[in-house]
Amino acid sequence: MADDNNTNGAASPTLSILAQYTKDLSFENPGAPRSLQARDKAPTININVNVNANPLSDTDFDVVLSLNAEAKDGDKTVFHTELAYGGVFRVAGFPQEHMLPVLFIECPRMLFPFARQIIADVTRNGGFPPLMIDPIDFTQMFAQRVAEEQARAKVEAVPN
């Protein structure tokens, strides 16, 4: 039987949530009460997602998941909501090359269900059906972010 204990003395990687919090929340219903009337078609909803991470110490990081949703009927805003939902994470024992994926994939993945519920509640409380945001592929978002940063670095490295 294989021994699952780490025998080389190195600590096994750990990821813990120390705190979760709403950093910023806003909901705008500029056309109320007219915007609450029945409509022929559903509004167009655009959702933007962003993740930021900042170190608090060698092992503790503040990760903020930002969700911005805007519903429009033609050129008129039906509702607009913004949420910055944060978590303080303790990240220890990971190799350095795994730190960014942990912070930008795993941490927001843990925050997302809570942020999604807040958005659903605030849109429902604003008089609309709850906005249930589809699951987000944070791995793909991170890969896209890395590719954009690499492309930017190549452009900046080209002499004029």
UniProtKB/Swiss-Prot annotation:
InterPro entries: SecB (IPR003708), SecB-like_sf (IPR035958). Keywords: Chaperone, Cytoplasm, Protein transport, Translocation, Transport. Pfam families: SecB. The keyword Glycosyltransferase does not apply. It comes from the Bacteria. GO terms for biological process: protein folding; protein tetramerization; protein transport. One of its GO terms (molecular function) is unfolded protein binding. Disulfide bonds: none annotated. Its main location: cytoplasm. It is found in: Cytoplasm. One of the proteins required for the normal export of preproteins out of the cell cytoplasm. It is a molecular chaperone that binds to a subset of precursor proteins, maintaining them in a translocation-competent state. It also specifically binds to its receptor SecA. Homotetramer, a dimer of dimers. One homotetramer interacts with 1 SecA dimer. Belongs to the SecB family. This is Protein-export protein SecB. It comes from Rhizobium leguminosarum bv. trifolii (strain WSM2304). The lineage of its organism: Bacteria, Pseudomonadati, Pseudomonadota, Alphaproteobacteria, Hyphomicrobiales. The gene is secB.
